[in-house]
Amino acid sequence: MYVLSVEKPTLRNKFAAGIGVVLVCVVASFIPTPVFALDTTKLIQAVQSEESALHARVGMTVFDSNTGTTWNYRGDERFPLNSTHKTFSCAALLAKVDGKSLSLGQSVSISKEMLVTYSPITEKSLSPETVTFGKICQAAVSYSDNTAANVVFDAIGGATGFNAYMRSIGDEETQLDRKEPELNEGTPGDVRDTTTPNAMVNSLRKILLGDALSASSRSQLTQWMLDDQVAGALLRASLPSDWKIADKTGAGGYGSRSIVAVIWPPSKQPLVVGIYITQTKASMQASNQAIARIGVVLKDTVAP
C-alpha cells in the first residue's frame, strides 16, 4: 500500500554519471541505495492513524528533491480533484502565455450570470469592469475563487484543453470533466474530476521545479501559491516561519479535503507533497487538523 521509489537520472546528471563511470565500476558495491530524507515509518503511522480516526480514505505522496525519492500511501488510488485543479488550470493558461497565444494582461468581462458559489474576488469585479487574466488566476489560486476558475477553464479550452495540457507534461491520470462547483461532487467510484496523489505530486514537481513552464511563468505561479489565503489551517499551521510553502487546497462532497504543496525547508532542497482525503463524515475542521498533524510529522522527520 505504501511505496518508496528512486527517481531515474535526469539529463542534468547524466554527464556527471558518465565521467564517473570508471570510479562507479570500482566502488559500486560500497554505495548504498539512496535513503529517503524522511522517517517513512513515522509517516505511514501518522497517515494510517488519521485515516482511522476520520473513518476516511487518505492518500499521500511526498517527493524529496534532496534524494530524488518518492514515498506514497495509496498514491495510485483515485481521489476527487476539487480545487487543487486550479493550480494546474492556471499552469495550462501560463503555458498559453509562454506560447504567445494569450497574455496575462489581456482583459475579460465577468457578468453577474457567470457568478457561482464562493467567488469572493470576482463578485466585486463584475461587468462593465474588466479583469486581466493575471488577476483572474491570482483569484483562482490565491483565493480559490470559483468563478475565476471557470473563466480560466474556458480560456484554456475547457476540459479538453485542461486534459491535453496534463497529458503534455506526462500526466495520464488527472482528468477534469466539469466546471465549478459541479466538479466537487466526489461520488465514490466516479472517475470524473479525479486524480491520484502520485500524479499530482509528479505534475506539480514538473511545473514548479522543472521546465514545464518558462522561468517567468513558473515564478508567477509559485508566487500565487505562496500567497494562498485559504490554507492557513492545513500544512501552514505545522511549519515554522522560516519554511516556505506554496500550496493549493481543495474541498468537496463526501468529506473530500486535499492539498498540494511545494515546501522549502531551510538550507534544503524542496519537498513536493500531496494529501487527499475522501469518503468521511468528519467535518472540514477535523480534516484540516488531520492534515496539520501529518504536517507536524513531516516537519519533525525531515533529516537534520
From Swiss-Prot:
Protein residues bound to substrate: K248, T249, G250
Entry keywords, A to Z: Antibiotic resistance, Disulfide bond, Hydrolase, Signal, Transposable element
GO biological process: beta-lactam antibiotic catabolic process; response to antibiotic
Region ranges (Disordered): 173-195
Similarity comment text for this entry: Belongs to the class-A beta-lactamase family.
Other comment: The class A beta-lactamase family has a specific amino-acid numbering system, sometimes called Ambler or ABL numbering and often misspelt as Amber. A multiple sequence alignment was used to derive a consensus sequence and then the consensus was numbered taking into account insertions and deletions. This allows use of identical numbers, e.g. for active site residues, despite differences in protein length. UniProt always uses natural numbering of residues, hence there appear to be differences in numbering between this entry and some papers.
EC number(s) stated in the UniProt entry for this protein: 3.5.2.6
Record-annotated active site: S83 (acyl-ester intermediate)
Top enzyme category: hydrolase
GO molecular function: beta-lactamase activity
Function: Hydrolyzes carbenicillin. Methicillin and oxacillin are weakly hydrolyzed.
InterPro entries noted in UniProt: Beta-lactam/transpept-like, Beta-lactam_cat, Beta-lactam_class-A, Beta-lactam_class-A_AS
Disulfide bonds: C90-C137
Protein name as it appears in the record: Beta-lactamase AER-1
Signal peptide: 1-37
Reactions the enzyme catalyzes: a beta-lactam + H2O = a substituted beta-amino acid
